[in-house]
């Protein structure tokens, strides 16, 4: 169009020159001023008999794929198109490949905001700037029609954006992560549960969503391995089954065994990669044993015992205390100095009865301890604070401590019973009997009993 206007201007100048030559040299200044006015006017189009009015070429939109989500109203429809484009640039569609190939000149001109003058004479640039500005603005208005934009350009709402980016499943995935984490908080001995990054099956964006998860530990009653006893003779060696729950207790407070100590407890042979193989085996059942871990409790001889052997030792100790402890001789020996008179014997008897009551209360408390051992897991009956204290002691001794104390207190109760018997027999004797005669009487009663 601009070249046609330039040709028309040159044609008019040639006609004026010819007319001046044939009209006795009188210049036609009004005609030139009108031509200059048409030439330098920035916006109005030139009306010439030989030039038709400019019309933009027809636009054929490229084929595009219809999206599944619906459109929403443009939130900036009440503003002008120029202001709407400046406020919300996301609502403007990205040009496709076909549009870039079809209109390279228009994109370069609109992107820079200035007309392109490549190939034009340098002298015409000041004269044609106004005409080209008007033409560019007309073309911009023509191509900014709403029907030329993609159907989803004005409706890139939150739902569509979430579906395009693959974020529609993220709330459900984070809920699942939160539920798993809540379950982890309810488990006992959290420190040994396997922890690692969550491997989400529905993660289209490959986001590094990581939280501490509890892959539920395998069946706690499942046997992890069998361990030969340390205290048994070679002729009667017995093996004790170590369950998954027991391994979890040994890795948890208060002991917090490391790989070296746990390998010794489980009687694993020392090797170059023994710690790594043990950690891999524990990882398969859902337990975590970090490398370089430090033990929390002081190592004793009881540390080397598994729970089965420790409980076995406590039972044997209780049997020996019940069957072999000399309760009667000890009671007779300690009661002799207090048989001088009825008042002294009565005071001694009251002391023994009080001690017997204390031992009974103490034994009943220890018998209500519900610390899990082996495959047993009973419901607690004591208050939480006292049960936690008893569990700490029982876990340190692997079940041996409470049962051993009960056996020792039972031996003490047997002594008290025998002492009360001696006092009762001495109290029934005549008061004029001397302590020596009382001793002789006790000896005769002992011989008669045998």
UniProtKB/Swiss-Prot annotation:
PANTHER family noted in UniProt: TRANSCRIPTION FACTOR AP-2, TRANSCRIPTION FACTOR AP-2 GAMMA
Region (Disordered): 13-63, 90-126, 431-450
Annotated crosslink Glycyl lysine isopeptide (Lys-Gly) (interchain with G-Cter in SUMO) location: 10
Example of a GO cellular component annotation carried by this entry: chromatin
Family: Belongs to the AP-2 family.
Name the record gives this protein: Transcription factor AP-2 gamma
GO molecular function: DNA binding; DNA-binding transcription activator activity, RNA polymerase II-specific; DNA-binding transcription factor activity; DNA-binding transcription factor activity, RNA polymerase II-specific; DNA-binding transcription repressor activity, RNA polymerase II-specific; RNA polymerase II cis-regulatory region sequence-specific DNA binding; RNA polymerase II transcription regulatory region sequence-specific DNA binding; sequence-specific double-stranded DNA binding
Compositional bias segments (type: Basic and acidic residues): 440-450
Effect of residue 59 to A: Loss of interaction with WWOX
Disulfide links within the chain: none
Renumbered residue ranges of the record's region H-S-H (helix-span-helix), dimerization: 293-424
Domain remark from Swiss-Prot or TrEMBL: The PPxY motif mediates interaction with WWOX.
Tagged with keyword DNA-binding: yes
């Amino acid at each position: 169009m601009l070249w046609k206007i330039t040709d028309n201007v040159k044609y008019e100048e040639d006609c004026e020159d010819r007319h001046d030559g044939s009209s006795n040299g009188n210049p036609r200044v009004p005609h030139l001023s009108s031509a200059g006015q048409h030439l330098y006017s920035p916006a109005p189009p030139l009306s010439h008999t030989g030039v038709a009015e400019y019309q933009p070429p027809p636009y054929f939109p490229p084929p595009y794929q219809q999206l599944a989500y619906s459109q929403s109203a443009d939130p900036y429809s009440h503003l002008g198109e120029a202001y709407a484009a400046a406020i919300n640039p996301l609502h403007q569609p990205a040009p496709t490949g076909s549009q870039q190939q079809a209109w390279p000149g228009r994109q370069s001109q609109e992107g820079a905001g200035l007309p392109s003058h490549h190939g034009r004479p340098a002298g015409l640039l000041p004269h044609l700037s106004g005409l080209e500005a008007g033409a560019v603005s007309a073309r911009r208005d023509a191509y900014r029609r709403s029907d030329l934009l993609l159907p989803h350009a004005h409706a890139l709402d939150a739902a569509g954006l979430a579906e395009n980016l693959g974020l529609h499943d993220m709330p459900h995935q984070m809920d699942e992560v939160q539920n798993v984490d809540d379950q982890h908080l309810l488990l006992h001995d959290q420190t040994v549960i396997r922890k690692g990054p969550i491997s989400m099956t529905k993660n289209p964006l490959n986001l590094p969503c990581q939280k501490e998860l509890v892959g539920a530990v395998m069946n706690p009653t499942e046997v992890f391995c069998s361990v030969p006893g340390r205290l048994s003779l070679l002729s009667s060696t017995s093996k004790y089954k170590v369950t998954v729950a027991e391994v979890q207790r040994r890795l948890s407070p208060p002991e917090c065994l490391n790989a070296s100590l746990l390998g010794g407890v489980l009687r694993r042979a020392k090797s170059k990669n023994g710690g790594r193989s043990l950690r891999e085996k524990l990882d398969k059942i859902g337990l975590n044993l970090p490398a370089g871990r430090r033990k929390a409790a002081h190592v004793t001889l009881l540390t080397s015992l598994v729970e089965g052997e420790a409980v076995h030792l406590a039972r044997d100790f209780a049997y020996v205390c019940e069957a072999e402890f000399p309760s009667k001789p000890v009671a007779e020996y300690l009661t002799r100095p207090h048989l001088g008179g009825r008042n002294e014997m009565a005071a001694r008897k009251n002391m023994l009865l009080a001690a017997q009551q204390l031992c009974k209360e103490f034994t009943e408390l220890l018998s209500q301890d519900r610390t899990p051992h082996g495959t047993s897991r009973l419901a607690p009956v004591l208050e939480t604070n006292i049960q936690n204290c008893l569990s700490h002691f029982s876990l340190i001794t692997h079940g041996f401590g409470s049962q051993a104390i009960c056996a020792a207190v039972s031996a003490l109760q047997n002594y008290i019973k025998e002492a009360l018997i001696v006092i009762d027999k001495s109290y029934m004797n005549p008061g004029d009997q001397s302590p020596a005669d009382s001793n002789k009487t006790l000896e005769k009663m002992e011989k008669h009993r045998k």
